[in-house]
Each structure stands twice: as C-alpha cells, then as structure tokens.
Amino acid sequence: MFKKRLISISLVVTLLISAKIMISDHLAKAHTLMVTANYTKESPEGIDDPKWREAQAVQLLVEGREKSTGDNGTVSTWSLYTDDSLYFLFKWKDPTRSITKQSWKYDGKNWHHLQGNEDRIALLFEITRIDKFATRGCAVTCHSPADEPRDNWKLATKTVTEKGDLWHWKAARSAPYNYADDAWLTVAGSPTGSYRETGRRKDAGKGGDLKNQTEDGTQPLYMQDPFKKPSVPEFLLLEEATKITDYSIFKAGDKIPFRLPIKPSGSRFDVKSISRYANGGWMVMLYRKLDTGHEDDVVFNSMKNYGFALAIFDDSGSDHSKTTEPMTLSFARK
C-alpha cells in the first residue's frame, strides 16, 4: 500500500512538472511578438495606398532609456510583400519633428551649433543565427553586459558566424534621399569613421553624410549653391553644396545644416523609404527586395520566419530611447 502511494505521489508530481513545462512553453509562445506580412500582387505606391488596409496593424510596445507610456510608447506596424519585395509601414507619435542635427547658426559674430538632433527608426534582422537574439532581441547586440560601463558598450555580435542586417532610417541624413542606410553587423573591430570599434559595417556603395565644418571646426565650410534650387527644402545635399568663399554675406540669424547627406548608391541603397511627419507623429514606409543578391543582406523567403528587433530614436544622436521586445516576421500564404 505504501509503495502504491509513493508511486501515485511520484506520478502526480511528474504530471504537475510536465504540465508546468507545457504551460510555460505555451505562455512563452503566446507572448512572442509576431508581425505578419500579407501578400499583395501589386506594390503599395506610398503611405496612403489603400493596399495597406489589407494588412492588420500590430501594436508594438517600445520602451527603454526614456520609458514610454500609453500611445507614445506604441509603434503601429503593417507589413506587405509581393513576389519580389517586402514592405513595412510604421507609425508612431512624436511631439517634435527633429531634423536639426546640430545645424549652424550665425549670431552676427560667430557660428554656433543649435541644440537638437534627429528622429530615427532602426530594424535589425538576423542574416545568420545570433545567439539569444530570439529571446533578448536588440539587447544582445546593442547593449553589452549591463555591468559594463556605458562607454564600453559596443554594437556587435559575439562571433564571426553571427551576422545581422541593419536598416537605419534617419530623418536628417537618409530621409532626404528616401532611403534607410543599409548596414550589417558582425564582431567588434576597428572600422574607419564614426563607427569606431563596433561591429557595425557599411554595405558596399555610397551614402551617409559629411560634417559641414572648416578644419578648425569653428564655422561651416559649405552653403547652398546659389545657382542650384534646393531639391529638398530644409536640407543641404552635398551634391548641391558649394564652398563658402565670402563669410561677410551672412547676417545674424542665418542657419546652415551641419550634416550634408551624400547621394546613396549600391547595396547601401537597397532599403528605400517614404516618410511624412504630420499630426504629431511620424509615418515611415520602408521597402526592399526579398533577395538583393548581396551577401551583406538577409534573404527573405516567404516560407520561413525571421527574428528581428526595432528601435525608435527620439531627437537622438547615439543611444536609442525606446526598443521593442524580440519579434518574429512571418509571411501569410498567398
């Protein structure tokens, strides 16, 4: 009798443990953030295209350094795909349209940088598997161990076999050319330029921006070419800029952009964008070929799922303010 009771108790405990594991697995799956791309035969032509109504919006909670609450912490996300391309539409509230990016202002005697940076949105996809990315998302690559000083944090993967595809839309630097800067992520190294010792690498091609300053950094070096009409109001494109030869032409209150967008090309120009700021918020459409043919990009297959993460930058030049939990991109069957 005693042995039977022990067997019964052991069986009950085993069943309870099994049930707990099953419930935990179910809850983990139930809380996975899923963004589903709906199939459409024709490409959406812009932000207002009726085709976006074919996709169901997913409300993604974003929070981080400046913890968000309510609608301010939500990014409405839609996704569509065609036979050869993938499309995203993002909408989020932002009380200010930040495109200043430290523009120059003349006070009548000297030039000074204005306060303010730019709004941005970034997506990171796995090209190859990144350890723990599926459960920790951006934190694995963007935030080094929490006990490390912030100055030691590196945007990187831990091994050379782990690679990420980074899409980085910037309101002041990429939006004027209607694209999101396409980069990829690997182990930390020593690349040239502003990326310093991170794992971030530029895709092949041209893009980015040039700092508009003299060698001593005290004043702007370029101005709008007076013989060229600005193709994008409020911005100074490098291809439309000319060197300043006479600073006496400026009067107090004059402003000149500090960051000059460079015309993009090649793989760096794979991710196109359409954007609009209105009614206290941004709407940004990003789209790209499912397969770009470039090794520095993830290849999307509509029969597979893909892990990714998203971050929102509010008037920020470095740390992102808000990020999502890890997410999965799936494709609805045709």
Segments from the language model and where they lie:
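Acidic/polar low-complexity flexible segments
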Residues: 23-49, 104-251, 278, 293-334
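Beta-strand-rich interaction surfaces with strong enrichment in secreted/lumenal proteins
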Residues: 75-78, 271-277
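Mature extracytoplasmic or organellar-lumen-exposed domains after removal of signal/transit peptides
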Residues: 79-80, 91, 302, 309
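A mid-sequence, solvent-exposed acidic-amphipathic segment
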Residues: 245-275
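Short, well-ordered beta-strand segments enriched in hydrophobic/aromatic residues
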Residues: 85-92, 282-288
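Bacterial N-terminal signal peptides
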Residues: 10-18
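Beta-strand elements of well-folded, non-transmembrane domains
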Residues: 81-83, 92-94, 290-292, 312-314
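N-terminal Sec-pathway targeting helices
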Residues: 1-9
